[in-house]
Regions:
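Active-site-proximal cap/lid insertion segments
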Residues: 1, 37-44, 52-253, 260-271
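Active-site segment of extracytoplasmic enzymes that catalyze sulfate/phosphate-ester chemistry
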Residues: 1-19, 23-32, 42-59, 229
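Short active-site alpha-helical segment characteristic of glycosyltransferases
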Residues: 20, 36, 255
Length: 272
């Protein structure tokens, strides 16, 4: 298994394994990827059957001072949607943003919306109380960190809203499945120790204030706080709005076969 000898897919890619983007491309879909890559060293167009790839971290940094650090990704994704709509071609699109990943440094205009927020630690469970204590131990300020984290989430909401509006304005709403999810639970404060020099440690410490809710653990753990993530679907006429399913158990291993079935895409049992 790759985890036994540190040959992680983030660094080495998928090898000969078949990906959902390759299968959908064979079925006539236009494919795009905007944002974090973490699936191997090669990211030129055509990799894994992806037609358009933008994983430019430099653009993300340059754009932070004006509209938020993922604005350029949304720009690219919306342009992809417009081009695809003109071609009247089915599509598959990944938008893997950076927002809420440390370091969290939101725009002042966003942070200002949460300037009156005060953290009442009594309202949080043991997991978050431990985080708060670790944050203070490293010199971070809990209230400032929470304000920044909320501002980053707000920035993400704005970006997703732009993307949804583009889908609707292009007349794609009724025939587009949109899924919002995450790769893992919130990061632990202990990651701040990887930054040896102040003020980096302080800055990172107060970045780690995402909550796993009632669950234990987070990123880098196999507890529910690490592996139980949101999975929100918008599919008009198929998935009822404003309903929560708390009984079904799903995994991202279900992603490929489910999409293949929904799109009448031929699947293969080789190298999956």
């Amino acid at each position: 298994h790759p985890a036994r000898f540190a040959k992680y897919m983030a660094n080495h890619g998928f090898g000969d394994s078949v990906t959902i983007t390759e299968l959908l491309k064979r079925n006539g879909y236009r494919t795009g990827h905007f944002g974090k890559w973490h699936i191997g060293p090669d990211s030129k167009p055509g990799t894994y059957g992806i037609d358009v790839i933008n994983n430019n971290g430099a653009a993300e940094k340059d754009d932070k001072s004006t509209r938020g650090r993922d604005a350029h990704l949304m720009d690219g994704a919306i342009a992809f949607l417009k081009q695809t709509a003109r071609k009247k071609q089915p599509f598959y699109l990944n938008v893997w943003g950076h927002i809420t990943h440390f370091p969290v440094k939101p725009l002042p205009t966003y942070a200002g919306r949460f300037a009156k927020v005060q953290v009442d630690e009594s309202k949080f469970g043991p997991e978050m109380k431990t985080k708060f204590a670790q944050c203070r131990e490293l010199g971070g300020d809990v209230t400032t960190g929470m304000r920044h984290y909320l501002a980053d989430v707000y920035s993400m909401d704005l970006g997703i809203g732009r993307l949804l509006k583009a889908v609707d304005d292009l007349g794609l709403r009724e025939n587009t499945i949109i899924v919002f999810s995450s790769d893992h639970g919130p990061a632990p404060v202990v990651l701040a120790n990887e930054k040896n020099k102040a003020p980096d440690r302080i800055e990172f410490a107060r970045n780690m204030l995402g909550t796993p809710g009632p669950f234990r653990g987070g990123k880098h753990t196999q507890w529910e706080g690490g592996v139980r993530v949101p999975f929100i679907i918008r599919w008009p006429g198929k998935v009822p709005a404003n309903q929560v399913n708390t009984t079904s158990v799903i995994s991202f291993m279900d992603w490929l076969p489910t999409l293949c079935k929904l799109t009448d895409t031929k699947n293969t049992a080789v190298n999956l």
